Amino acid sequence: MFKQFFSSSLKTLHVIPSKPFTRRLHNLFLRDRLKRLHHEDHNHQHHHDPMDPKLVKPGISNVNEHFVHDETFIKSYNKLIEGNKAFVKEKTNIHPDYFKELCKSQHPTYFFISCSDSRVPPNELTKTDPGEIFVHRNVANQVKRSDLNCQSALFYAVEALKVSHIIVLGHTHCGGIAAAAKNQSLGVVDLWLQNVRDIAVSNRAELGLIKNEHDFLDKLTELNIKHQALNVCKSAVVQKAWAEGRKLRVSGWMCDIETGYIKDLDVAQKDWEEIKKFFQFSFTQEKH
């Protein structure tokens, strides 16, 4: 590798090294490297190397000594690895070529924009397999024009994957919604949740009638899901798909964590019809 690196580097300078020259460079490099390794070993002889084979337990790599000797961490870590093995075994027992087929391509029907909350994983909630849904997740399931991550995923889902259904998935007991409802500074999170606060202000008359905090947060969650689903409708890539005659549906779902059940809020496209004249793009090219 060293020889190849030097040869390619010198070629860019229009110098073709001879074999003896390259060999000398190689030897000089190795000599210098050995000196530095010896120096480092001398300076750190009293420190434990976290990657020492004597310290590292099977199945764990790239962790420091503290975690290597933390039995709770080891059990938790190994649970993930064993869970993966069980998952693979379950799939291949039914269909031996499951993953060979899966790696060829993906053709998901659905694109989920979901909250990052660990209690609402879209695949598990809908009992879908790998390859069935394309997923983007963030705190409080936001769909912002300024969020290149979300907008890129949306564009890819519609234009490349040709999904037929986009679902914004929110949930009860959302920490992001609760944080947005409080008059308390949360640092950088304030910037992310400002949109939720704006939704609360825009609907203050309706929300002001609710006296119970639980009901207030549930209503704000619904309003947020509705707003984000409409933001999906406002996107150019979705409107372009509709202009081309594609049957692309947009929905807003709310998961009740207390029961596990999902409720279709039936809001997105119905409300879009009422406001589309203000946000609809034109995709016809003007004739000059």
Indicate residue ranges for each PLM-predicted region.
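Gly/Ser/Thr-rich loops at beta-strand to alpha-helix junctions
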Residues: 117-119, 171-176
